[in-house]
Amino acid sequence: MIYHITSRQAWEQAQANGEYRAESLQTEGFIHCSTLNQVLPVANNFYKGQSGLILLEIEPALLSADLKWEPPSGGAPPPGVPVGDLFPHIFGAINLDAVLQVVDLPLHADGTHNLPTFRPVNL
């Protein structure tokens, strides 16, 4: 599984449109995603203090768009991610049937995030 952090509003818009398109798809040519081990470092580095975020759990085999594993787009990984880790980048819109779960990304009083609980998914 791979994961993408977004706002509930963006996800609701995706459901209305029939596909999910992050702003980065237009500006960088791909949608940033993470492995489960990368989610918290990414969330706490780039989204600290932001409420109303959700986490999309995505099954790569169900994606219609191309998926590539690449170094972080900024060069060095965020603190907490080992040097050399590759990140999943989706080069196109995310088809909704590839999203297996949508869960709230909990926010602590200090502005840091916590990993949500996922339910098992049988494909």
Features from the language model and the residues they span:
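Conserved, structured core segments of small domains
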Residues: 1-123
